[in-house]
């Protein structure tokens, strides 16, 4: 055990531990919040583990919510904040390689910590600021390594998503994989196929947006994890570019666009790929637009109206994508051209469909064609953005 200075987020939660202890129970801060305290990383909330059973937690606090009571978790509302409190437990029988078939509540913190994924996440801290470290998590923090608790293969058979969490933590923390843990991922990477795509995607995106994604991507590819991901099997050579980026992506849509370009997805294959990863329709659409913009800009054939249709957000994203791929596209020139456009949105056009109808144009395909012609004329600088000038330009 060692001592650590307790910061504000823990100080605010301290009365919760005190109240549990006053009721005769043990209570500790556990997991990632303790790890991040020691690494001096931002902490947004804390997790609390206790010897109290869920019903005893509910009896101890006036306000609570049964957020995961079957697995021992109760959310209590106290002092204007909410806290997840979980009973010490053991788990067994992971037939789906993700969730335990059986959860057993125990009265011993040691047993609870044994079920956790990595040594750096198996740390606990009591109300006095003492760190309880059964697996040399403190040493692994100093060595900056991701190491499984106990036998790595057992941990990954319990929850195969932990393999993706390992490489995600590499990226976020700038840590390396402990060799036995790495070998266990190589031996068991096929188990990732048992995990829902949504959960894999969440870890994949966090990996990509982490501060040290290059090394994490090296192990993502080398351990075989990429082979179990939608659309990435057999693509190690193309994806190896991810291991050489000077800086990783800082935007999720740009990241997916980068993947689409690296694996040479034709335009009509982007949507199926994005759907296979269970991405939202909005993300799907944005990625298709970014890749299309990147392809157009790469050819150097873009008109002012093309820039107008691309729009500022997708233009900036396409330029980021070009930078990641080592294909600088005169970014400032293109942005300056965009900023000089007379209008940036169709709603800024001096006329609309109702105005054309008042001018005698019947609702018809012709009306849409005239609006398009007016928009192109204004954007390209052929005509001033005024009703009179547009009327003359359209000869109506």
Curated annotation (Swiss-Prot):
Q: Which residues are recorded as binding CTP?
A: 32, 35, 116, 159, 162, 165, 168
Cofactors required: Mg(2+)
Q: Which UniProt keywords apply?
A: ATP-binding, Magnesium, Metal-binding, Nucleotide-binding, Nucleotidyltransferase, RNA repair, RNA-binding, Transferase, tRNA processing
Q: Which Gene3D superfamilies match?
A: 1.10.110.30, 1.10.246.80, 1.20.58.560, Beta Polymerase, domain 2
GO-annotated molecular function = ATP binding; CCA tRNA nucleotidyltransferase activity; magnesium ion binding; tRNA binding
One Pfam family this chain carries? Answer: PolyA_pol_RNAbd
Record-linked CDD domains: NT_ClassII-CCAase
Q: Which InterPro entries match?
A: Bact_CCA-adding_enz_type3_sf, CCA-adding_enz_C, CCA-adding_enz_firmicutes, NT_sf, PolA_pol_head_dom, PolyA_RNA-bd
Decide whether keyword Calcium is in the record: no
Gene Ontology terms: biological process: RNA repair; tRNA 3'-terminal CCA addition
What are the annotated disulfide bridges? Answer: none
> Which parts of the sequence bind Mg(2+)?
45, 47
Catalyzed chemical reaction(s): a tRNA precursor + 2 CTP + ATP = a tRNA with a 3' CCA end + 3 diphosphate; a tRNA with a 3' CCA end + 2 CTP + ATP = a tRNA with a 3' CCACCA end + 3 diphosphate
Keyword presence, Nucleotidyltransferase: yes
Residues binding ATP, per UniProt: 32, 35, 116, 159, 162, 165, 168
* Entry EC number(s): 2.7.7.72
Its biological purpose is as follows: Catalyzes the addition and repair of the essential 3'-terminal CCA sequence in tRNAs without using a nucleic acid template. Adds these three nucleotides in the order of C, C, and A to the tRNA nucleotide-73, using CTP and ATP as substrates and producing inorganic pyrophosphate. tRNA 3'-terminal CCA addition is required both for tRNA processing and repair. Also involved in tRNA surveillance by mediating tandem CCA addition to generate a CCACCA at the 3' terminus of unstable tRNAs. While stable tRNAs receive only 3'-terminal CCA, unstable tRNAs are marked with CCACCA and rapidly degraded.
So what family is this one in?
Belongs to the tRNA nucleotidyltransferase/poly(A) polymerase family. Bacterial CCA-adding enzyme type 3 subfamily.
Give the multimer and partner information.
Answer: Homodimer.
Q: Which HAMAP family match?
A: CCA_bact_type3
Record's miscellaneous remark: A single active site specifically recognizes both ATP and CTP and is responsible for their addition.
Q: What is this protein called?
A: CCA-adding enzyme
The organism of origin for this protein: Lactobacillus delbrueckii subsp. bulgaricus (strain ATCC BAA-365 / Lb-18)
Q: What is the lineage of its organism?
A: Bacteria, Bacillati, Bacillota, Bacilli, Lactobacillales
Name of the gene this protein is made from: cca
């Amino acid at each position: 055990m060692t001592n650590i200075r307790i910061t504000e987020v823990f100080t605010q939660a301290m009365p919760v531990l005190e109240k549990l202890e006053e009721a005769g129970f043990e209570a500790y801060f556990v997991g990632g919040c303790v790890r991040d305290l020691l690494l001096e990383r931002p902490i947004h909330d804390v997790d609390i583990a206790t010897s109290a059973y869920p019903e005893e937690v509910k009896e101890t606090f006036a306000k609570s919510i049964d957020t995961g009571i079957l697995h021992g978790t109760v959310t209590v509302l106290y002092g204007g904040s909410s806290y997840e409190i979980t009973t010490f437990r053991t788990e067994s029988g992971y037939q789906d390689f993700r969730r335990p078939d059986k959860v057993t509540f125990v009265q011993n913190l040691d047993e609870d910590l044994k079920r956790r994924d990595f040594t750096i996440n198996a740390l606990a801290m009591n109300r006095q600021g003492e760190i309880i470290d059964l697996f040399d998590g403190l040493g692994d923090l100093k060595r900056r390594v991701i190491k499984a608790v106990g036998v790595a293969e057992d941990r990954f058979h319990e929850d195969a998503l932990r393999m993706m969490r390992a490489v995600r933590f590499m990226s976020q923390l700038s840590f390396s994989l402990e060799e036995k843990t790495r070998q266990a991922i190589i031996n068991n990477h096929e188990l990732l196929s048992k995990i829902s795509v949504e959960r894999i995607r969440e870890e994949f995106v966090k990996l990509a947006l982490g501060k040290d994604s290059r090394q994490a991507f090296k192990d993502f590819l080398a351990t075989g994890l990429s082979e179990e991901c939608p659309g990435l099997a057999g693509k190690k050579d193309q994806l190896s570019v991810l291991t050489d980026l000077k800086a990783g992506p800082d935007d999720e849509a740009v990241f997916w666009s980068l993947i689409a370009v690296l694996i040479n997805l034709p335009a009509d294959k982007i949507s199926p790929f994005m759907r296979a990863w269970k991405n939202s329709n909005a993300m799907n659409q944005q990625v298709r637009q970014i890749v299309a913009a990147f392809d157009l800009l790469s050819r150097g054939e873009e008109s002012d109206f093309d820039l107008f249709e691309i729009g500022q957000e997708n233009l900036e994203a396409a330029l980021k994508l070009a930078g990641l791929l080592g294909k600088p596209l005169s970014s400032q020139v293109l942005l300056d051209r965009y900023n000089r456009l007379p209008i940036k949105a169709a709603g800024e056009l001096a006329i609309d469909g109702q105005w054309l109808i008042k001018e005698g144009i019947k609702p018809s395909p012709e009306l849409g064609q005239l609006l398009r012609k007016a928009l192109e004329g204004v954007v390209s600088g052929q005509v001033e953005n005024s009703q009179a000038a547009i009327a003359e330009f359209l000869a109506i």
